[in-house]
Design a protein with these regions (language model features):
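Short structural boundary motif marking the start of a folded domain
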Residues: 2-9
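Short N-terminal binding/cap micro-motifs at the start of the first secondary-structure element
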Residues: 15-21, 50
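Glycine-rich beta-strand-centered segment in the early N-terminal region that forms part
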Residues: 30-48, 56-100
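N-terminal Rossmann-fold NAD(P) dinucleotide-binding loop
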Residues: 162-163
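Adenosine-nucleotide cofactor-binding segment
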Residues: 170-182
Length: 182
């Protein structure tokens, strides 16, 4: 019998302002078993992003709200513990929407990618080499196509994407104007 416990952070109530600890609950659940085509991942790093404020709201925006009683949605980096998919093997490090929990069973197709082969810390897959960093990189360099000496104005420069855009613009030789706050 599996003695492991899956600690999960679940959304208990919807905040009307800034989320606080009282809006969440920690639940101990059994570690789930993967079915065919699925992978059991043990989370190592969880992402905490500004977008989560919208996810705990009752109002749908670009994605559905997290349901009350559900595990908090989150990108994570984890280690494959068990695999019922030929695409992933135990010991590999992967990233995906695994949630705030110790273990997640996910469809192999929902795993974004294998990480850890670059020699950089695997946590960078949630930051500069993850969704936010790649969004900044491609938005600025492929769409913006800045040239040295130009001025780059970065709104929301204190955010995850904006802070990366500002740094990339500086590297490219731009005069960077960062806007943060009201």
């Amino acid at each position: 019998m599996d003695q492991r416990v899956n600690r999960q952070v679940r959304l208990k109530s919807r905040p009307s302002g800034i989320p606080k600890a009282e809006h969440f609950e920690i639940v101990e659940a059994p570690v789930p078993d993967p079915s065919n085509g699925q992978v059991l991942v043990r989370n190592i790093y969880l992402s905490v992003d500004p977008a989560m404020r919208g996810w705990v709201s009752a109002v749908a925006n670009y994605s559905e709200p997290v349901a009350l009683g559900a595990v908090m949605r989150s990108l994570a980096v984890g280690r494959v513990e068990e695999s019922r998919s030929s695409d992933f093997h135990p010991g590999e490090y992967v990233t995906g929407m695994f949630g705030w929990q110790d273990y997640a069973v996910v469809d192999a197709a929902a795993i974004e990618r294998e990480v850890g082969g670059s020699g950089l810390p695997i946590s960078t897959s949630l930051g500069v080499l993850g969704l936010n960093g790649l969004t900044a990189y491609f938005a600025l360099l492929e769409i913006g196509q800045p040239k040295a000496g130009e001025t780059a104005v970065v709104s929301t420069a204190a955010g995850a994407v904006g802070s990366c855009v500002g740094q990339i613009a500086e590297i490219k030789g731009c005069r960077t104007v960062a806007i943060a706050g009201g």
